[in-house]
Amino acid sequence: MKTSIAIVDYGMGNLRSVAQALKKAEPAADVAIVDTPAAIRAADRVVLPGQGAMPDCMRSLGESGLQEAVIEASRTKPLLGVCVGEQMLFDWSAEGDTKGLGLLPGKVVRFELDGRLQDDGSRFKVPQMGWNRVRQSQPHPLWDGVPDDAYFYFVHSYYVTPDNPAHTVGETAYGAPFTSAVARDNLFATQFHPEKSAEVGLRLYRNFVHWKP
């Protein structure tokens, strides 16, 4: 029986790219972009993407009527948050003083890198855009087959700061180390974009399809 994966369509996120990457990572999976609570409830696994500003994402999710179904899914099935979809899982964001879903304790803060210089003498830029390494700070099934310190693709100005250090499973350095992947029970989320991260991103998506938390 095929594993069904619902990509939540609340009007914000790189949905087609995520769907294409999941299908490429595991052709046997039944991947669908969905916009109804019933479709989220019917799926075996859920992906919560997000891009842009967290206030816009939270408002759109609330207006879509899908928020309660996402919260319900977070309690009962594997759920993967991507980029702003990761940030939305937390309690609060400094971006627009925005309340999150409160599924993971912690907050979202902005890079404070004004005037800071990188090792090559150039200034740090915010947002961080481009490839950067992810150190696997804790083992996890979604890291299976993904080399430690592999490069993933980032586009963001804000990052999560979990209250519980045990929830951090990936760290990246940009001015200072920050949490770039989190996990707890059936939740996993990344600040980076697996769908833009070549083979290591596809491997992570494939691991999500087969993950049995």
From Swiss-Prot:
GO terms for cellular component: cytoplasm. Pathway: Amino-acid biosynthesis; L-histidine biosynthesis; L-histidine from 5-phospho-alpha-D-ribose 1-diphosphate: step 5/9. Residues 4-213 form the Glutamine amidotransferase type-1 domain. Heterodimer of HisH and HisF. This is Imidazole glycerol phosphate synthase subunit HisH. GO terms for molecular function: glutaminase activity; imidazoleglycerol-phosphate synthase activity; lyase activity. Its main location: cytoplasm. Its EC number is 4.3.2.10, 3.5.1.2. The keyword Cell membrane does not apply. GO terms for biological process: L-histidine biosynthetic process. IGPS catalyzes the conversion of PRFAR and glutamine to IGP, AICAR and glutamate. The HisH subunit catalyzes the hydrolysis of glutamine to glutamate and ammonia as part of the synthesis of IGP and AICAR. The resulting ammonia molecule is channeled to the active site of HisF.
